[in-house]
């Protein structure tokens, strides 16, 4: 087998993209009897699952070609709450006055109606128009808990230290968003986006515009360009 490969991996939850690279590198070393260079073409957060494209050997020189490709995700959002990281790994808080079912709010540890008059639960039409407003070229500010470099340091490392810093916004393109399922507070969507788009930020921005707040409870990448997760190998 050629050691210069395009390797499609279906990443499970709970492992970092760098952890996947290390595993594949180890497997190739066993297979070929020597170290083989392996690199990724765009990370997934540890809690996320789905398609990672790894390149080995001389193919690593083509990483920039893959970094530019569009991506398709399936995402699950929880409305009515926010997270310090935009996903399940952060500290979860109830969004002020967001629509709720009433009764005790287990996540926030208090009555869901303690914050004064509630905004109504978003109806389907409001949800559709709000989500539709994000289609096209938009300005997006990447999350502070991300791998973006700020003065040579990863943003997530600065955020963990409590360092105060700002990340400049940038233009990204949302080609399409489809609502797959909606039963408040849970929302499932399918997004086709340009390279560099953060789905965590998109989820938060949708929540802000709805007046409910939102964070990601699940994220799965199903396509990168023409490469599909259906053709990817499962992690051993």
What are these regions (language model features)?
Residues 1-106, 110, 114-236:
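Catalytic/RNA-binding core of pseudouridine synthases
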